[in-house]
């Protein structure tokens, strides 16, 4: 299932948001 891939993208997205 793609949950792992989506989870990784989501974590990366959230990390980028926190860096701003």
Swiss-Prot record:
Keyword Secreted: yes
Compartments where found: Secreted
UniProt key word Ribonucleoprotein: no
Entry's Gene Ontology BP terms: defense response to bacterium
Secretion signal span: none
Expression by tissue: Expressed by the venom gland.
GO molecular function (one): toxin activity
Residue positions where Glutamic acid 1-amide is found in the record: 20
Main location as per UniProt: secreted
Keywords: Amidation, Secreted, Toxin
One Gene Ontology CC term in the entry: extracellular region
Family statement drawn from the similarity comment of this UniProt entry: Belongs to the cationic peptide 04 (cupiennin) family. 04 subfamily.
Protein name: Short cationic peptide-4a
